[in-house]
Amino acid sequence: NLKLHNIGTHLSPQLTFCTSATKRGSFFSTLQSELEKILTTYVSDTSKILGVGISLPVIISSDQKSISYAEVINASADIYYTFCKYLNFPLLLFNDANSAGLAESWRQSGSEPIVYLSLSSSVGGANMNGHSIYTGKHGRGCEFGHMTIVPRGRKCYCNRAGCLDAYCCASILSDFTGGDLHAFFEEVKAGKNKGLINAFDEYMDYLAIAVHNLRMCYDCDVILGGYVGAYMSEHIETFRNKASELNPFEKDASYIKVCHYKTEASAVGAAVYYIDKFVKELGE
């Protein structure tokens, strides 16, 4: 997917495309040509482009040019340099959940700390303090998907057992409806399939444990994002009740919020990084 964003009061995605190219060289060539089409259509002066952000479900090294861990997708550690061959602009790599967290923080003006929990093909997250992303000493900060929720529980793709990812990634729900998450939530909404309703209730039970733990650790708002988060608005009160039952300090669970960006939050965040940097430099 490609998104183009400008600097303004609101960030407006101009175009999204999906490429079906599977071969490495073909993919990058397609990416290059599609980017050129977008720029020709929307940008009269490409010298004003601040940069290109590449958002990936991997752990990024501190230089934002190399990958230190990749299991969800097959990405080489030096993929940055391949991108550079095809994209003739300043370029950085971003963890997808961190980017999405930055997008949500920007949307909320960034004045309050937030925790963003991404519930997509894998589970990740971000801890935002203002527009600053906490990445940790080794770039593995906020890898919430690998918090242990059930000791010796289900096997995770990391080869450990009991990780949140094994209980709350989007496929836990979408697998019931042939990989179609929208269809799953439509079935739940219809209220006739008790099996799916019970599966979603169990999903929320595990998710509530995770969100409660995040509240205890960070004492700030927790935003539900990713593929599943986009569908949580209709179920948020039920979910808040589950989380509040675990909390010894407060019964008000309004700190749990649903993401603003229902799709492509990580793409927005990768663009916001450059915009935020530019705005800060103007103020210096």
Go through each PLM region and give its residues.
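Glycine-rich phosphate-binding loop and adjoining helix at the ATP-binding site
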Residues: 14-40, 47-113, 234-246
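Glycine-rich phosphate-binding loop of actin/hexokinase-like ATP-binding domains
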Residues: 111-167
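ATP-binding/phosphotransfer module of carbohydrate and carboxylate kinases, centering on a glycine-rich
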Residues: 1-48, 108, 152-155, 160-284
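Hydrophobic "anchor" residues
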Residues: 11, 66-67, 133-134
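Short glycine-rich anion-binding loops that position phosphate/pyrophosphate groups of nucleotides
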Residues: 57-59, 120-122, 228-229
